[in-house]
Amino acid sequence: MRVRNQLLGAVCAVPLLALGAASVQAASIAKHCGPKDKYVVAFSQANYAEPYRQHVNNDLTELAKAIPQFDLQIADGAGNDNTQTSQVDNFVTQGVDLLLISPFEAAPLTPAVTRAMKAGIPVIELDRQTNGDPGKDYTAFVGGDNYKIAFEAGAYTAKTLLPDGGDVAVLEGLPSSTPAVQRLNGFKDGVKQNAKIKVVAEQAADWLPDKAQTAFSAILQAHPDVKVVYASNDMMAAGSYLAAKGAGKEGQIGIIGTDGLPGPAGGVRAVASGQWAATFTYPTGAAEALDLAKKILIDCADSVPASVIVPTLAITKINAADLDKKLKF
């Protein structure tokens, strides 16, 4: 049964691929393939609550329409490991031809991915990863370099926002997810380029705006001299802005997000309007993931890149207004 998702999203320009050096061996490629057959491509999404994930779903849905051999089915993991595990196991039982997955958390979803691989179903992990290595424990990974994206945000803070130094706070995503750990470490390493910067607070807000608002409000009370806050996604950046505004510090604190989503509630608009200092795009990887799926199922490829890394773009006051006008929502 085809699942259709009526979701708001944006169609952004697809960047060039940066392909990992390792390749998957033939044993990991689909058992059945060819251009004349129909294939069920199942996607287990971590949740539908985050705007970024809606954006991913929308991109996949729109792009899959151009591939007549594909029947794309999307399931909402609802931010619950047990729910997502059950959905993946159901896909395996149904005998889908290829599994895409953005795991809610790494460790809890690893056994389900292992079961899919043992059943002979190619698995492409999108945005987030389970434990193990792409090309070995699962077929391939498609996503941004979370560490590098956050490192660039840290470097931007060190060189542009706080060249004379100052106090900085960090709002981390869900600590048990790979992007949260990678972005936290990347930003902290990036700001080390300026020895005068001090990270005075780190707080997990689980990617959620309300938790970010509460956390940053408490941080501002404990550290009133904070000049910049790095939020690991745009939703937490939005919560940080509300906290700063509530503390009477609107316009006094540089807010940095990650995702670079378009639209009225997205990070691009927030930077263009002057509410935030910057955000860094995290492309959906939808086109790249479907391209790998085509190679595996339609082209009968005997090897595919184990990692496809999509590059980021810094959105600042220099380019935000122009991008906001160009991007569709």
Residue ranges and their predicted role:
Residues 1-38, 66, 114-121, 321:
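Short, low-complexity disordered leader/linker segments with a strong preference
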